[in-house]
Amino acid sequence: MQNSPTEYLKPRVVDVDVISPVRARVTLEPMERGFGYTLGNALRRVLLSSIPGFAITEVKIDGVVHEYSTLDGVQEDVVDILLNLKGVALKLNSKNEATLTLNKSTEGVVTAGDFDTGHDAEIANPDHVIAHLTKGGKLNLEVKVEMGRGYQPVPQRRKTEDEDRVLGFIQVDASFSPISKVSYQVESARVEQRTDLDKLIMDVETNGIIEPEQAIRDAARILMGQLSVFADLEGAPSEVEVKQAPQVDPILLRPVDDLELTVRSANCLKAENIYYIGDLIQRTENELLKAPNLGRKSLNEIKDVLASKGLTLGMKLENWPPAGLEKV
């Protein structure tokens, strides 16, 4: 218990509940009033955005020249195969980049476990389904695996619009984050006669590449590194220009009608409560394909229109929707 206004309670880890190999709930208490929300929100944001991981960034499939192709003897089309490859959770132990191969010609299910990983790569979800082969079908592919942070659509990774691409390789949007879900809860805590303290409960789920407890430790170290400069704050020798936080891009506040989609596509979006472009870009391809009456043709139309404006599906926006935004 602190004895003066300049002393603060230091929380301790009181419980680590390992719910599964990929999920854990960590409880810390006691904290000064308000610190639970302050630290919980900071840790959550760092966990979701700043923990490095690995993802498939390019794919080469034998017999395929573009993503809208189909393969004989394979139930899924190439677009579906690419979507399934995005769900493969993997890591490299000693490299930041590698190429993995998968070759299968027997009838049945093709899973992530069919990759030839060698000695350096590990796959956390080997049962993840990539495709289904019928009699006589075969699937031979190569994937490029890279290390990164957060979500990076293809246009963001290209150095220039006319960047040279390796012949036969299809670039895909990459989600590098190994964190699947993060939530936090703040409850009341008590120390002696004080009942106005906080207890912070962090609930973290990963894709299996990193343990939840290690992810929390890494996030805390990132925060400490960023905040340490404030602890040793000194007068700067020269003025440093401080850039204001960017405002919401005006294009995201425009209604989806401004995209001039076909009537069918526009009606499907509104039926899913997607009224603004900012609503649309946060949806993934899988989510849109689950919408009634929205098929592959409509999805491709939406992706092409967004790409023409430098946007893509699956983007993440902070503080959306902005205050005062109304349904149209």
UniProtKB/Swiss-Prot annotation:
Region (Alpha C-terminal domain (alpha-CTD)): 248-328
Catalyses which reaction(s): RNA(n) + a ribonucleoside 5'-triphosphate = RNA(n+1) + diphosphate
Class of the enzyme per the UniProt entry, highest EC level: transferase
Cross-referenced SUPFAM superfamilies: C-terminal domain of RNA polymerase alpha subunit, Insert subdomain of RNA polymerase alpha subunit, RBP11-like subunits of RNA polymerase
A Pfam family assignment: RNA_pol_L
Source organism, top-level taxon: Bacteria
Nucleotide-binding keyword on record: no
The entry's keywords: DNA-directed RNA polymerase, Nucleotidyltransferase, Transcription, Transferase
SMART domains: RPOLD
GO biological process, one term: DNA-templated transcription
EC number: 2.7.7.6
GO cellular component: cytoplasm; DNA-directed RNA polymerase complex
Region (Alpha N-terminal domain (alpha-NTD)): 1-234
InterPro entries xref list: DNA-dir_RNA_pol_insert, DNA-dir_RNA_pol_RpoA/D/Rpb3, DNA-dir_RpoA, RBP11-like, RNAP_asu_C, RNApol_insert_sf
UniProt GO molecular function: DNA binding; DNA-directed RNA polymerase activity; protein dimerization activity
Physiological role: DNA-dependent RNA polymerase catalyzes the transcription of DNA into RNA using the four ribonucleoside triphosphates as substrates.
Family in the record: Belongs to the RNA polymerase alpha chain family.
Subunit annotation: Homodimer. The RNAP catalytic core consists of 2 alpha, 1 beta, 1 beta' and 1 omega subunit. When a sigma factor is associated with the core the holoenzyme is formed, which can initiate transcription.
NCBIfam families on file: PRK05182.1-2, PRK05182.2-5, rpoA
UniProt free text on domains: The N-terminal domain is essential for RNAP assembly and basal transcription, whereas the C-terminal domain is involved in interaction with transcriptional regulators and with upstream promoter elements.
Name of the molecule in the record: DNA-directed RNA polymerase subunit alpha
Lineage of origin: Bacteria, Pseudomonadati, Pseudomonadota, Betaproteobacteria, Nitrosomonadales
